Design a protein with these regions (language model features):
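Active-site neighborhoods of metal-dependent hydrolases
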Residues: 1-143
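C-terminal cap of metal-dependent C-N hydrolases
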Residues: 99-105, 110-111, 123, 130, ...
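Flexible loop/turn segments at secondary-structure boundaries
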Residues: 82-86, 114-118, 158-161, 187-189, ...
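A short, hydrophobic/aromatic-rich structural module that often spans a beta strand
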Residues: 161, 227-229
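Acidic, glycine-enriched loop/beta-strand segments at the rims
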Residues: 87-97, 142-151, 159-196
Length: 229
């Protein structure tokens, strides 16, 4: 059966009940409902297909249920039937993040895809705020990392691991990939309501020695190049 036939079966309360039972009792690692603590409050709707009520955007599945006048499980099935939504599952808590940061071998990265605000309709806020958040929250606010260690985990440590020996350090002979920021002002401001907002407190960014952010303004230059080991 195809997608349309499957979606049609979701109108059957018996099918919904069976799917719910399987999800609640299956311990497989691909079960994201378990990853979020089996709580629809931990699943945030970030965008929706054309046939979906736009009021559910930026709400959890539980919050969407309140808007739609139903319970969370039926809201989930109703949203799938209406065309689907994109979600952000909150599968890690702060304690788990602190445990990871306590390990000296842990690097800091993000899997967000690079996007151009002038040509892209949407993005994940981590594309614009992941690294500034490390400094504003885990260095300045929580004190979980020193500034030097945070920078190391986001630059030289990753460069060494990837075998990029001429990058990641500020030293004679190194490629000038540099970022100048105010450690007291840098912070992420992007969120799911407005994901493509540049972080604050970053004044200059140099790629291969060329300023791509110049006094806080994006420059119309393309000095980057493909790196091959």
């Amino acid at each position: 059966e195809g997608t349309s036939e499957f979606l049609a079966t979701l109108a059957d309360p018996a099918v919904r009940a069976e799917l719910r039972r399987e999800v609640e009792t299956t311990g497989d690692w691909e079960n994201w409902y378990r990853h979020v603590g089996m709580d629809w409050e931990n699943v945030l709707i970030v965008s929706a297909a054309g046939g979906v009520d736009e009021r559910v955007i930026n709400r959890s599945i539980s919050g969407a249920a309140e808007v739609l006048g139903t319970d969370a499980w039926d809201a989930f099935f109703d949203l799938v039937q209406a065309g689907g939504v994109s979600v952000n599952p909150r599968s890690m808590n702060e304690e788990q993040k602190w445990q990871a940061l306590a390990a000296e071998y842990v690097m800091i990265d993000t899997d967000a895809s690079p996007v151009n605000p002038a040509t892209s309709a949407s993005a994940h806020p981590r594309a614009f705020g992941a690294f500034p958040r490390v400094i504003s929250k885990y260095v300045r606010q929580d004190g979980a990392l020193s500034l030097e260690d945070a920078v190391r985990r986001m630059s030289s440590m990753a460069a060494q691991r990837l075998g990029l020996h001429d990058r990641g350090f500020v030293a004679p002979g190194q490629i000038a990939d540099l970022l100048l920021f105010d450690p007291d002002a840098i912070r992420d401001v992007a969120d799911f309501g407005d994901a493509m907002r540049y972080a604050e407190g970053i004044d200059y960014v140099f790629v291969n020695g060329v300023a791509v952010i110049d006094d806080g303004v994006l420059a119309d230059v393309r000095p980057g190049r493909l790196l091959r080991r």
